[in-house]
Amino acid sequence: MNLASQISQAKTGNATMEWAKNYVSKLNDGQLALLQKMYADHQAKLKASEDEKKKKEMEELKMKAQQQAILDSLTQQIPIMVDVLRSSTSPDSQPSSSSSVMSSTDEDQITVKDVLIGKINKAQRQSSPNSSKPYTPRGIRERVLFDEHLYVFDKCSYDSKKRFFRCERKNTCPARIHTPFDAERVIHKVQVHNHPPPTTFDLAHYNIDYGKVKSGHILSLNGPQQTKNLLPPSLLTPKSDLEDETLSTKTEQKNASTMNILLSMTNNCDGRKPITLRLPDLFNKISEMEIHDMEMTLTKFLLENRELRTDLISRNGDLPVFFPNAHNDELVLFVADQHENDSVFQMIRVSERNEKSIRQAIQEHLQKVSNRSLMMNISSKINVPLSQQMIDQWRTEEFIRLDSSKPNFWKIHHVSKLQD
């Protein structure tokens, strides 16, 4: 069956698998490469659409989970992280000068109920400043021992890399120290103490192990976990005057169990180790069975796309265009060896459209040097120097065969049709 009958059979729609096999076997390397490229692009588009669809579904599920978590935190009173402004003295006993009030911001775990009760109590204090209820601090700050003096935790730096401590007598003593977030050493001291260090009798109730005291390091006397244990139950979870004590205890147990479940889930997720895959340096040769499967897949793709069959038949050896949207000033050369019939075209990008840039790009590709200008082959006996006028007539993509057998006489053979 000749080519004309194959074309007529394809146009009439009577294409069979046998016809497709015969047709694909007669395609040259350029046409097969174009067919494979179009098939790969088609598969890539399908995969991209599926990935985008999965990504949207994951985002929707994540958004629903976040909304459900917020709803649960509001209805079930799951602990949330809020900033609590705390002072060491009673609001009634604080002086009017703002400079003498030493307070800072800490992060505590409290419930939505506690926030609402705190706002109600604050409104009551503002409406009745002479309230009969005594002021009680909400917690105990972390205390450390350094250079025979006691320091109280102040705050963390804005980048969460350092912690700031101030002297225990913070209202009268200006001494400060800075420590790293992940180490118990002092990296900076600010000013000096204006009072003598506390006596051994004053530090007796801390049970200090002086054997662990190191020069330049701090010794924690009550860490964040110990601080919570030192607080009485009435300060850990504030209770409303109208709420029963038994009900609040059950609520605390429920919140604690919920937080334990969330922490265990977080720890399990954090324990996952990333897996890194590395492609092999050398790939094994493709077997005949795999080649047959690839040909059958391409044949099926060819049978399903009538426009592709018509496009391949009408090309008739025309040069492919890989960069249709390239700018007119750009130049890409596909270079092959003139003395090898099966030589593969290698892509070379040229920085500027002139002979010097073309020669320099070819030299970098071949790892050779030519001291003379490139020659353009016109016929078997005529070779002329490559001029700027010739280069200006070139397209953005040009196929050439290079004869570099003579060191200072490189000849360029222009390719206009792909060989069958």
Swiss-Prot record:
InterPro entries: FLYWCH-type_ZF (IPR052887), Znf_FLYWCH (IPR007588)
Species classification: Eukaryota, Metazoa, Ecdysozoa, Nematoda, Chromadorea
Pfam families: FLYWCH
Biased composition annotated in UniProt, kind: Low complexity: 87-104
Species this chain originates from: Caenorhabditis elegans
Gene3D superfamilies: 2.20.25.240
Ranges for region Disordered: 87-107, 119-138
Keywords in alphabetical order: Metal-binding, Zinc, Zinc-finger
Gene this chain is encoded by: flh-3
Stretches with biased composition (Polar residues): 123-134
Gene Ontology molecular function: DNA-binding transcription factor activity; sequence-specific DNA binding; zinc ion binding
Protein name in the entry: FLYWCH transcription factor 3
